Amino acid sequence: MTWQRPDGRQPDQLRPIRFHREYTHFAAGSVLAECGQTKVLCTVSVQPGVPRFLEDTGQGWLTAEYRMLPGSTPERQRRELMKLSGRTQEIQRLIGRSLRAALDLQALGERTLVVDADVLQADAGTRTTSITGGFVALVDAVNQLVSKGEIPQSPIRHHVAAVSVGLLEGQPFLDLNYPEDVGAAVDLNVVATEQLELLEVQGTAEEGTLPRPQLNQMLDLAEIGIQQLIEAQRQALAS
C-alpha cells in the first residue's frame, strides 16, 4: 500500500512557504513564516550584555524562546507560565543551537540576540518553520545593527534552514503536515546550511527500527527540501 498525501503533494514536495518580513514594528527583525497551514511569528530582539560565562570575552550570544499560542491548535493550548514542558524546552534549545551556528559570535560583540518563535497556527513542522523563518528575522536584525554602525559587518556566516522527513508505508515523504506527522513510523528533523552541512538530525523510530539505507534516503530527501527553503529565504531577503 502506498501512502496518499492528504494535500496531494508529491513525496519530495514542500508545502507552500512564505516569509512576511517586517511583520511587527518594534523588534529588530520580525517575520511571519508560513509553511502550509503552519504559521509562526519569528522576532529577534537585541539586548546589551551576555550571559555571565561570556562576560569580558568580546563574544556575543543568541538564545531562543518558543511558545504555542492558545488558539494555535483545534483544542486550546494552555499557556506555559511558571513551568515549561519538556517539549518546549527541547524545541527552544534546538532553535537556539541552530541559529547560533549561523553566526560568528565574536563578530557580534558583547550583546545578546533573543529569538522568539510564537506559533500562531500549528499543522506540524513548528520547530522547523521556527528555525527557517527565524533565520530570515535574524538577518534583518543584524543588518539593522550594521546600518546603525553598532557592528562593522554582518556576522552571518551561512544560511540555515530546517525540514522534516517522515516514513509512511515504508516510503519517505518531505515536510510532513499533521495527519502525516501522527501517522509516520519514523519522524526526522534535519537542520543544515546552504552547503548541506548538517547542524542537527533528530530522529525517532516510532514503530520498529530504521534501517540505514532508509535513513540515507530520508537525508537525501531532506537535502532537496533544505535547498528549496534556502532559495526561498534568499528571495525573501532580496525583496
UniProtKB/Swiss-Prot annotation:
One of its GO terms (molecular function) is tRNA binding. Its EC number is 2.7.7.56. It holds the Pfam family RNase_PH. The keyword rRNA-binding does not apply. Gene3D superfamilies: GHMP Kinase, N-terminal domain. Keywords: Nucleotidyltransferase, RNA-binding, rRNA processing, Transferase, tRNA processing, tRNA-binding. It comes from the Bacteria. Phosphate binds at R87, G125, T126, R127. GO terms for biological process: rRNA catabolic process; rRNA processing; tRNA processing. It catalyses: tRNA(n+1) + phosphate = tRNA(n) + a ribonucleoside 5'-diphosphate. The keyword DNA repair does not apply. Belongs to the RNase PH family. HAMAP family: RNase_PH. Homohexameric ring arranged as a trimer of dimers. Phosphorolytic 3'-5' exoribonuclease that plays an important role in tRNA 3'-end maturation. Removes nucleotide residues following the 3'-CCA terminus of tRNAs; can also add nucleotides to the ends of RNA molecules by using nucleoside diphosphates as substrates, but this may not be physiologically important. Probably plays a role in initiation of 16S rRNA degradation (leading to ribosome degradation) during starvation. This is Ribonuclease PH. It comes from Acaryochloris marina (strain MBIC 11017).
